[in-house]
Structure formats: C-alpha cells, structure tokens
Regions:
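Compositionally biased terminal segments of proteins
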Residues: 1-294
Length: 294
C-alpha cells in the first residue's frame, strides 16, 4: 500500500477501511491479555465510532496505517510486556521501521503500525518513550529491545475516554470470521488529539477528520455536541481547551481548520470557498450546541 501523506483525499481508499480494521483486530487479538491495555486511535476511529451513516453522508476516507495507544498502566509496567508485544509483531510478519515506534509489514496489502502513549511527567509530548533499567530496575529488558512509543499531548484521555466497539471482522490470511470487541478512543479524546495535530503539523486530513466526525454523527453536529457532552471527560479542563481551539481553528473561512479541510477535500481549486464555508458551518453548529462545561 502506498502511504498517503495526508495532503489530499485522492491518496485514500475508503474501501480499505474494513480490511484495515480487520488487520487491527487481528493484531489486538494476538496480543492476548495485553489487549485490555491497548486502545485503537488514529484514522480508523471515525468509521468505527460512526458505523451507520445517515442518508447522503459519505463514508470516511479511511487511513493507511494502524495507530495503537498503550495505556499508562502498560507503559509504566513491567518492561517484559514490551518484549512480548515485539515478539508478537514479528510473529505476524512485522519489522521495525525507520523509527522504533513504527513497525512495517510488506507482504499482502502492506501495513504500518505505530505505537503511542499518553504524555506525562516523564514522557514529554513528541518524544519517543522507552523505559530503561533505571526506570524499572526489575525489568529484565529495555522496552523489548527495540519497540517504543511516541508520547502524545492528548495524554491519558486517549486511553480513558474510550468506546468499546463490537464488530464482526473477517480476519486476514483466511483465519476466519470473528465477533470481537475493540477498545477505541472516544470522540472527545479523538478531537483533542486531532486539534493538537492540526496545530502542530501540515496535514490537512486532521481538519477533515474533525469535520467528518461532527458532521457525520447520527443526527448531525448539534446531536454530536449533546452526545459528546454526556461523556465523563467533557468537564476536564484539557477538553475545554481543545474545544476552544477547535472553535478558533474554524471560526472563519481563512482560519487554519477551514482552509485545511478545503485543501484536503477539493478536487478543483474553485470548490475551496464552498468547502471552507461548509467546514465553518459544521463546527459553528457543533460548538453552539455544546453546554457549559463548568
């Protein structure tokens, strides 16, 4: 699979979404008891959170990789857990990529799996984290030898604001069909991670992911706002900050959010003004319906 760069919708194939979700399920299933400490984040999340679309809503464009976030309990636990993860990955045909949190498999459709963890006092955002012997003197190995995780600013919310999604998956390599549950990061954590990403890199798909989630939520942006506000994490200060940042990023057609959305979706530059207005309108409806979080 050619790795898209997040610049334009043309680089993505929504028909691969189910196949990638099945690959993610296969990896999580292979991790055994550690699966309880792993949450699926990233581009597969919107389609899993909104599996049934209202009439006229286009499917999410999908993604080209699988992003897994390790819980704080796993990150700060026995370093031997990471060796087990690495061993399982190798057994599934993966090898370390250009950085130690990215693992690749070249056969079949080709897969990239990236590992993340919540940022914390000893795990600054944007840095690769790998416990050392001094951090965990009882561990026999140094984070499984090679495997590491990239710390994300969204923090612990990524693994506490979660949804357990039940789906039927057709596992790869003719392993059969299985009904199983995936732990998926919830909508508030997803929005928080995406607005952090939008502000920190030039990947227009981040804006698309934000708009698609609130616009495609069953019932539309206002219903999304009411639904998200019912989540326990809604009143956390970092969520309030993230939602304010989303409001600002889409406050006008020339703001970074609206421009990024239009750049990603437009097939003709003449369509960009209309797409900018669409993004501004969707987010305006969403934030207007959000109740006071104080």
């Amino acid at each position: 699979m050619n790795e898209p760069d997040g610049q334009h919708v043309a680089g993505y194939d929504p028909d691969l979404a189910d196949q990638l979700a099945a690959e993610a399920a296969d990896i999580v299933r292979s991790l055994g008891f550690m699966a309880a400490h792993i949450v699926l984040i990233g581009g597969l999340v919107p389609g899993l959170l909104v599996p049934v679309l209202d009439p006229g809503v286009e499917p999410h464009v999908g993604t080209a990789d699988i992003d897994l976030c390790l819980s704080v309990a796993l990150v700060e636990g026995d370093t031997e857990a990471y060796e087990r993860i690495e061993t399982i990955l190798k057994g599934l045909g993966f090898q370390e990529g250009d950085v130690s949190f990215r693992w690749l498999r070249h056969d079949g459709i080709g897969l990239t799996v990236e590992f993340f963890c919540p940022a914390g006092e000893q795990r600054p955002a944007g840095r690769v984290f790998r416990p050392s012997h001094s951090d965990n003197p009882t561990g026999k190995h140094n984070f499984g030898g090679r495997l590491s995780a990239l710390a994300l600013e969204a923090g612990e919310l990524l693994t506490t604001d979660i949804e357990v999604v039940s789906r039927t998956f057709v596992l790869p390599q003719n392993k059969g069909t299985i009904d199983m549950e995936l732990r998926v990061t919830g909508p508030l954590a997803f929005l928080m991670a995406k607005i952090d990403a939008l502000r920190g890199r030039d990947k227009p798909k981040d804006a698309y992911d934000i708009v698609w989630l609130v616009e495609s939520w069953p019932g539309g942006p206002a219903v999304a706002a009411a639904s998200f506000a019912q989540r326990p994490a809604y009143h956390r200060p970092e969520v309030t900050v993230a939602l304010d940042s989303i409001r600002d990023a889409f406050a006008a057609t020339d703001r970074i959010g609206a421009r990024s959305y239009a750049r990603f979706v437009a097939t003709d530059i003449r369509d960009e003004p209309q797409l900018e207005r669409r993004a501004v309108g969707a987010i305006a409806e969403f934030v207007a319906a959000l109740p006071d979080s104080n």
